[in-house]
Swiss-Prot record:
Binding, pyridoxal 5'-phosphate: G118, S119, D258
Top-rank taxon, per record: Bacteria
NCBIfam families associated with the record: bioA (TIGR00508)
Binding site for substrate: Y151, K287, G322, R417
Lineage: Bacteria, Pseudomonadati, Thermodesulfobacteriota, Desulfuromonadia, Geobacterales
Keyword Cytoplasm: yes
Pfam families: Aminotran_3
Subunit-structure text: Homodimer.
Pathway note: Cofactor biosynthesis; biotin biosynthesis; 7,8-diaminononanoate from 8-amino-7-oxononanoate (SAM route): step 1/1
Residues the record marks as site: Participates in the substrate recognition with KAPA and in a stacking interaction with the adenine ring of SAM: F21
Protein name (Swiss-Prot/TrEMBL): Adenosylmethionine-8-amino-7-oxononanoate aminotransferase
Residues recorded as bearing N6-(pyridoxal phosphate)lysine in the entry: K287
Reactions accelerated catalytically: (8S)-8-amino-7-oxononanoate + S-adenosyl-L-methionine = S-adenosyl-4-methylsulfanyl-2-oxobutanoate + (7R,8S)-7,8-diammoniononanoate
Location, primary (coarse class): cytoplasm
């Protein structure tokens, strides 16, 4: 492929690419950063400037960019087989990966249904739960419980179980209705508690009330375990997830865990559900499954869920769902190489020290005048900016303070993305101690510059 100069690439980009979650009028008036290389925790633009990737290529990168072992696995697979369908066939890489996923997943999740992104992985889970109850002779169980501030993707089924009006409101007429429960947001408690210490898990009490009032009609509950991602990296109080599992058991509701963002070591455990010792009935995976290299997703289910779909063909119990690139051998080979690196690098064993260091560095930010909250779960962190710390008054969204802080961070060699007034910290798990220092120091300087305090 020939090399093109930066300005040519910028011009072609503005002429031809429609970027996600982007106001293109502003984009067309900007000078986009063109990334051409990656190395470890860094991305490098067409002019040679290096940026610490503080968002792990949008919450996907695990072992760093351009990791040799993964590159070699991908190259080797390209020379063997690029793609083969799972409709009527199987392939060796998909088989081996499914076995390994079942071995490391929360106990009981033993069946793997492949797709190609997080939204579809969630939709697969929703459709499984819906059809499951029909096969069980309970078609009245057809509704879903979702949470405020939830985000499960951008396809219509995933949007239906989401809860972010900024993203989803315009599509409301296209969506199926869900039953929405309050999600815990300890900094801005929906139950009016002043401090996390005063938390009495009223969100669980309200969830149980909702389940009781819709007894016999709920097929499944969809939840982001431990952390609500796009809602603002909102960390759930300890015990909430386990409480949700207990309520689902009590009311005969399938629990669907969306681990698309939090899976594969991000919370300090291989899977977030493992932090509270629970097994969902269905679990959606993507993003980190290939360490940020390839589009691949998987929806894991228990034997009980799977068995409900077994029968003679004429019984029409087949799960009629699939995607062209389901179980793609290239993606599966990369995912296997990533799992190998988890073991050879002893990555999970190294995370506690990194998590602690990040926690210590973030403590300094809470003293800043316009930092209202700093929250963290594993290698996920968020800094919520406010106009007034005492009242928690947020900055007006029109001021775009979060965007301005992230743009300023680029001048300090750090690439970040905001969620409104919330600055997200989500680096590759392979980040070093020195790079954690660099990231947080750059963020602190940027907050000072933009907010003046």
């Amino acid at each position: 492929m020939p090399d093109y100069d930066t300005q040519t690439l910028r011009d072609w980009d503005r002429r031809h690419i429609w970027h996600p979650f982007t106001q293109m009028k502003e984009w067309e008036e900007s000078e986009p950063v063109v990334i051409v290389e990656g190395e470890g925790s860094w991305i490098i633009d067409s002019e040679g400037k290096r940026y610490l990737d503080g968002v792990a290529a949008i919450w996907t990168n695990v072992h760093g960019h351009c990791r040799r072992e993964i590159n070699e696995a991908l190259k080797a697979q390209v020379d063997r087989l690029e793609h083969s369908t799972l409709l009527g066939l199987t392939n060796d890489r998909a088989v081996v990966l499914a076995k390994r996923l079942a071995e490391i997943a929360p106990p009981g999740l033993c069946k793997v249904f492949y797709s190609d992104n997080g939204s579809t992985a969630v939709e697969v889970g929703v459709k499984m739960a819906f059809q499951f109850w029909r096969h069980e002779g309970k078609p009245e169980k057809s509704r879903f419980i979702s949470f405020t501030s939830a985000y499960h993707g951008d396809t219509l089924g995933a949007v239906s179980v989401g809860g972010i009006d900024l993203f989803h409101g315009v599509f409301r007429p296209l969506l199926f209705p869900t039953i929405q429960a309050p999600a815990p947001y300890c900094y801005r408690c929906p139950m009016g508690r002043d401090t996390p210490a005063a938390c009495g898990m009223e969100c669980l009490t309200e969830l149980e009330r909702i389940m009781e009032s819709h007894a016999g009609e709920v097929a499944g509950l969809v939840i982001e375990p431990l952390v609500q991602g796009a809602g603002g990296m909102i960390v759930q109080p300890e015990g909430f997830l386990k409480g949700v599992r207990e309520l689902c058991d009590r009311h005969d509701i399938l629990m669907i865990a969306d681990e698309v963002a939090v899976g594969f070591g991000r919370t300090g455990a291989m899977f977030a559900c493992g932090r509270e010792g629970i097994t969902p009935d269905i679990m959606a995976l993507s993003k980190g499954i290939t360490a940020g290299y390839m589009p691949l997703a998987a929806t894991l289910a228990t034997q009980q869920v799977y068995d409900a779909f077994l029968g003679e063909y004429r019984e029409m119990k087949t799960f009629f769902h699939g995607h062209t690139f389901t179980g793609n051998p290239l993606g599966c080979a990369v995912a296997l190489a990533s799992l190998d690196l988890f073991e050879s690098d002893r990555l999970l064993g190294k995370l506690p020290n990194k998590i602690k260091l990040l926690q210590e560095k973030l403590k300094g930010l809470i003293e800043l005048e316009h930092v209202g909250d700093v929250r963290q779960c594993g290698m996920i962190a968020a800094v919520e900016l406010v106009r007034d710390r005492a009242t928690k008054e947020p900055f007006d969204w029109e001021e775009r303070v979060g965007v301005r802080v992230c743009l300023e961070a680029r001048t300090h060699g750090v690439f970040l993305r905001p969620l409104g007034n919330v600055i997200v910290i989500f680096p590759p798990l392979a980040i070093t101690a020195e790079e954690i220092d660099f990231l947080v120091d750059g963020l602190e300087k940027s907050i000072h510059t933009v907010t003046g305090g």
